[in-house]
């Protein structure tokens, strides 16, 4: 029957469009998740460096304090800065792991 064949062709075209749209959507999502992972990794590395620098500053101020060349307020401020930077580092690590998980979920790994 001609109308049945025509209807089947129309359904086929609809399904093909749906498939193509899904592929495009998945490709866009993949690119976005790759970008998110790269950005999270860069932030993680920056925060890691910040922790290293802030730790050195704290250590130096602590040594100065031992020799009477720095106040307890300076040690407290450096310690607070170190804790803050460590917190940012942990958050960056968490963001990186979450970005990796999201990409792996998309890739079914």
Annotated model-derived regions:
Residues 1-52:
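Sec/SRP-type N-terminal targeting helices
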Residues 6, 77, 98:
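Solvent-exposed, flexible loop/coil residues
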Residues 16-23, 55-62, 100:
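Structural signal for well-ordered, non-membrane alpha-helices
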Residues 34, 38, 90, 97:
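Conserved active-site region of classical short-chain dehydrogenase/reductase
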Residues 42-91, 104-105:
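Charged, solvent-exposed structural "stalk/scaffold" segments
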Residues 98-109:
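Short amphipathic coiled-coil heptad-repeat segments
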């Amino acid at each position: 029957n001609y109308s049945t064949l025509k209807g089947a062709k129309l359904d086929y075209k609809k399904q093909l469009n749906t498939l193509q749209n899904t592929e495009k959507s998945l490709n866009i999502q993949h690119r976005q998740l790759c970008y998110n992972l790269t950005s999270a990794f860069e932030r993680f590395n920056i925060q890691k460096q910040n922790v290293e620098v802030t730790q050195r500053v704290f250590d130096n101020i602590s040594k100065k304090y031992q020799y009477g060349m720095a106040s307890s307020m300076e040690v407290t401020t450096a310690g607070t800065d170190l804790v803050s930077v460590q917190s940012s580092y942990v958050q960056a690590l968490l963001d990186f792991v979450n970005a990796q998980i999201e990409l792996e979920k998309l890739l079914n790994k």
